[in-house]
């Protein structure tokens, strides 16, 4: 965070700064640290030694540009070169060469990496910090049991527990535990050293009997006892070197390696003074931990809160990339060791370049970015989605929690999250509370802790100092809860203010305050900070809003919001979507695909993005905002991107809305809209779909791309050029051929149809032996072809197939079934599109654009939408834009309502429209029914809120099935639109059909249309010939499956005919 020109003022840090700092830390420190760990490698005879000279490593500038990497599905990476030496010990000769170790994917200006043509981002992980934690639990008798858990750097745990007799045990597995004396002795301490280093030696001596003395008589006997308990081995194992190695690998490496963060935490918690470079668990640590545990037993000491952020650490992009580089170097070490031995065996002279291969590093990073749970494909629905994705924090992933086992307490908001993790923005569903979002001012500290900035209040000095505090430090300060804006520090402060101290919220005098917040949005994430009047909303609805803003579709004509929060500009700029001038100069030339800027003696050509597809099929497009000959300054907006206007985020539209019921068409969150939104292209968006096909070399020969497909009709091939690829700019419909392809196949006489054999026999015509495998346009894909790419990779073998990609643009107007939402969690589905003349209209004759249900407000408690609605109306009439800071009630009571009413009153005066503000019902107005012209009985709230169109569109959801695939086991239709699946008729649906008495429809759904194999085959013949469908005589497949499953449980199910006369069972089986 940077200090401004005025003392005490600050700017919001870049939203991608955490990603940039993490990657720079990996390049500057992480690479060097891991290269220094690379050992010297010797051959078996110890004649040759290989080593790396870490002081001189270099990363080469990539050969390709970012755009080309995306275009050709390549990785945007840098080659890593290191000096290596090969030393012959007998002659003391050394051969030094610069070797190529591998490719390391680079980070671009968006904070993402391009791997195989895809934008990928690494999100931050929250893990339990290594160290020791004390807690107590009640046993079945209601007695407190105290335990101390040592968490290693790898996530392994070693538990110390104390029983009723004050004996201390170390739990080595779920069932097995050993005495603390045995563990200390196995780690190298004798009894005298143990008793000298503890505060309560009499307690240790109290449970030292003869049997225990024998176990700790020597280090070897202690190790044997430890191994016997740990590995659950019976008999009398013999001490050996291999036994020690196994114990070291399986226990000590996983549970006793603390790392530098763990060493620092244990030193602080146990008041030790062990050097920081000693990152392994020592006997002194175990004994000091036992002392503290005894103190806990007798009421001395404080238990740890495991969910406090001071007990968590952030595993950032730097740590994850460094771990992968270390793993790659271990693999490289094994390769070099094997290559040296092979060269000596075959009497070859090795060189450093011959010994090293780039495969381990390159493949490790490719598999990490492709398969690791914390490496995700960048969500590029809109600019907000891009920057929010990189600021996520996750408890999930390797070494973390899982969605099914995480408790409610871990998911809940903790006081230490204040200013660090947003209390609102989290995912919905099973991962709620486990995936959060960092607050806008939060940063990752040196020790992996989340830090938040505060202003220090000092009586001695008038200067305001800004501090970044970790969660462990700000507990000791009285923190005022943001009682004033950072810009208004000169105003007289109130005498009594709300404050936070040691996780409690208090009300104290201003003189006692140590720190105060620096910004009203300090506690929120970017998504929550874009919600105006957020303090008037229920937190659940604010959560939905911050998630739904990320689902907004960029519209063809974007529009700035009338009511905003002030963060829209920075959110747009940090997303990298608008083009910004890097230096001042003059515009020489501009058109749709580039801007040429002249300045500082250079001429710079800036390319613009033209109809680029995002991974959510939305359209990314840039439009120049400067004219030729205009002089510009550094930082000025040159071009707007998708969903930005004038360098500000613009996700939706300001539309005229009325809150009223209308013939039941807006019940249950349905929305009624005017046809003006369709014909005026208000909510029209462009979507780009990608279709691709590959050509392979088969065993019968290579596949061919051609426009001569004998199997198909001519009108399906009308859009193909001479090469067999669809012509750029052509309009294509469902079923049209995009790429013509023929696959050769084996020609057998028996495989020909009878007419083909006749043609061959009579006329000697050679029938085609190729099968058409063309790329056809699927259902719902109609549109305009805007781009065709034929990617030919080097080599041309079957392992490097040629790829042809066709991009088709669709123009989608808003329609019935689409989802729209406001910024307060008020979402709904379009239920009906009314003609303009039928919509309710205002007193000045304007018809409203949307009609929302007023019952959706009081029960959801998202009243912020009413404030935004009314203020938007005033802003639309006065041609003003408002930027509202949250929690303005701290300045005066009812501040938000006063602001809205004053602006409505001013709009009423300036426009001479008294209906805008009527004192009897302020904020409401009488409106008229468009069908009859009569006024409605009650006054209605009307306004101009900001409404978004979401990515959940009916064109992507609508689906029908006449016939399709069936599951192999149950013989029932598959599930899902992608598999052409059917609609599920469950238990409650059956009840509903039974309630209406539709027996035949119910029978069809459970037999013909589902899993009765014979009956569904007969239906086809009956519909062709005519007549009635025969009733099924035997059971459907799912019933037969149930019978088979019962048989597998040794339960036989038989059925018999029962006589109607005497109800006796006829033993003849039916």
UniProtKB/Swiss-Prot annotation:
Species of the source: Vitis vinifera (Grape)
PANTHER family, sorted: DNA-DIRECTED RNA POLYMERASE I SUBUNIT 2
UniProt similarity note: Belongs to the RNA polymerase beta chain family.
Superkingdom of source: Eukaryota
Task of the protein: DNA-dependent RNA polymerase catalyzes the transcription of DNA into RNA using the four ribonucleoside triphosphates as substrates.
Metal-binding among keywords: no
InterPro entries (alphabetical): DNA-dir_RNA_pol_bsu_ext_1_sf, DNA-dir_RNA_pol_su2, DNA-dir_RNAP_su2_dom, DNA-dir_RNAP_su2_hyb_sf, RNA_pol_bsu_bac, RNA_pol_bsu_CS, RNA_pol_Rpb2_2, RNA_pol_Rpb2_2_sf
Protein name listed in UniProt: DNA-directed RNA polymerase subunit beta
Any one GO CC term of the record: chloroplast
Compartments where located: Plastid, Chloroplast
Catalytic activity: RNA(n) + a ribonucleoside 5'-triphosphate = RNA(n+1) + diphosphate
Source lineage: Eukaryota, Viridiplantae, Streptophyta, Embryophyta, Tracheophyta
Enzyme Commission identifier(s): 2.7.7.6
UniProt keywords, alphabetically: Chloroplast, DNA-directed RNA polymerase, Nucleotidyltransferase, Plastid, Transcription, Transferase
